[in-house]
């Protein structure tokens, strides 16, 4: 059995995967949302520890605030003993890891400023007494987690987990990591790219018409570097794309799959449904009719309606299921995201079904369930 919890994380990602049999689970945590999610992140670690189970992989996909900050705030709240018992591996690409592992494959500029040193825990917890925050590396050292860190992840690698589960990485590539190490950009929460914020005019158009609109390409070095992977357990396959670029994921898929396409049971849309992080080629290659969207709508910036139109365009005769952890289509757009024609052609006919996740299980396939809250677990 696999349980997926796509937890509300404001504009970010915060995903918990539990897999196992007979109510005994292994766990994967993927990102931790914004800093407001820190308490819940800590609570989940405590729940797993109380069950005497393990976090096989804590994946921090990349440096952006809306993915990493809640995880770091949560780690701060948990005792070293619990973390030592519970967390087995942390996957996060750092400058030091990139430099150490890839310096022979491309020109990596020497820098006195490491990316990871710019990531700080903002809150002033008593056990540290640090006013300006504690650096990422220092946090791992003080929490006894430094030796659990896998700090250079590239596509083609694989993590073998207990009970026959695997994580096969499809992003980033070596070239992208080297570029990221040399050109990384500090994430500004309120300063997004123009194409990321161009959704308002598009929602006035019909989905059928938007199928002719082109998808864009994300130029951010930060979003060339996120960790993306395929999780497999028995017959269940899940694709978690973080904020990864589709062109990089396509290269990664070629590293793990010889066929021209790859079937999965669920795909977490990259970058919260941004127009710049999905492509027709990706949708044709990683095939599914079940999509997960993690966003609160982020001030009407995501998801791009063009992306939804292309999900439908590439679906063929299949109906599309879109699982959401916020009802952004109502709250952000006052129920005007979909036009009358959209509702007639796609919503009413169930060609596009939207599901708002809560603590009740929705079955994706036999043995695989998705939630938006974890309740009593």
Model-found features: residue ranges?
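Conserved beta-strand hairpin/beta-sheet module of binuclear metal-dependent hydrolase folds
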Residues: 1-51, 221-247
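C-terminal regulatory/interaction regions
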Residues: 2, 10-13, 254-261, 285, ...
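Active-site environment of divalent metal-dependent phosphoester hydrolases
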Residues: 11-13, 35-36, 63-68, 97, ...
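A short acidic (Asp/Glu
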Residues: 16-17, 67-73, 101-103, 250-253, ...
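Extended hydrophobic/aromatic segments used for targeting, binding, or gating
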Residues: 27, 239-309, 313
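Flexible, acidic/histidine-containing loops and adjacent segments that form or flank the divalent-metal
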Residues: 78-237, 320-325, 337-377
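Active-site metal-binding motif and surrounding structural segment of the metallo-beta-lactamase
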Residues: 25-26, 39-91, 258-276, 285-292
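Hydrophobic/aromatic beta-strand patches that form the interior of the parallel beta-sheet core
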Residues: 5-7, 28, 59, 91, ...
């Amino acid at each position: 059995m696999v349980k997926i919890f796509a937890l509300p994380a404001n504009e970010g990602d915060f995903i918990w995967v539990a897999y196992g049999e007979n109510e005994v689970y292994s766990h994967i945590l993927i990102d931790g949302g914004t800093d407001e999610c820190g308490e819940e992140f800590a609570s989940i670690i405590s729940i797993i520890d109380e069950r005497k189970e393990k976090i096989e992989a804590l994946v921090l996909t990349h440096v952006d605030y809306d993915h990493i900050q809640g995880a770091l705030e949560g780690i701060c709240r948990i005792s070293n003993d619990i973390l030592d018992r519970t967390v087995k591996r942390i996957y996060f690409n750092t400058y030091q890891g990139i430099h150490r592992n890839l310096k022979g494959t491309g020109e990596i500029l020497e820098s006195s400023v490491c990316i990871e040193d710019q990531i700080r825990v903002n809150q002033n917890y008593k056990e540290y007494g640090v006013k300006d925050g504690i650096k990422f590396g220092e946090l791992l050292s003080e929490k006894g987690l430094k030796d659990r860190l896998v700090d250079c992840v590239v596509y083609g690698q694989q993590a073998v987990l207990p009970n026959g589960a695997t994580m096969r990485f499809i992003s980033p590539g070596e070239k992208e990591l080297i570029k990221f190490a040399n050109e990384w950009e500090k994430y500004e929460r309120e300063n997004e790219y123009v194409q990321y914020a161009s959704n308002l005019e598009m929602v006035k158009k019909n989905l059928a018409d938007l199928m002719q609109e082109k998808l864009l390409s994300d130029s951010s070095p930060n979003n060339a570097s996120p960790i993306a992977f395929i999780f497999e357990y028995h017959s269940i396959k899940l694709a978690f794309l973080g904020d990864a670029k589709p062109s990089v994921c396509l290269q990664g898929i070629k590293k793990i799959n010889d066929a021209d396409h790859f079937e999965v049971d669920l795909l977490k849309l990259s970058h919260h449904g941004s127009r710049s992080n999905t492509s027709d080629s990706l949708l044709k290659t990683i095939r599914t009719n079940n999509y997960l969207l993690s966003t609160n709508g982020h001030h009407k910036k995501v998801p791009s309606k063009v992306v939804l139109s292309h999900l439908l365009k590439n679906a063929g005769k299949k109906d599309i299921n879109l699982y959401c952890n916020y009802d952004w289509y109502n709250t952000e757009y006052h129920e005007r995201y979909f036009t009358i024609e959209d509702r007639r052609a796609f919503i009413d006919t169930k060609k596009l079904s939207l599901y708002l996740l809560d603590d009740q299980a929705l079955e994706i396939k036999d043995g695989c369930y998705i939630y938006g809250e974890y309740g009593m677990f």
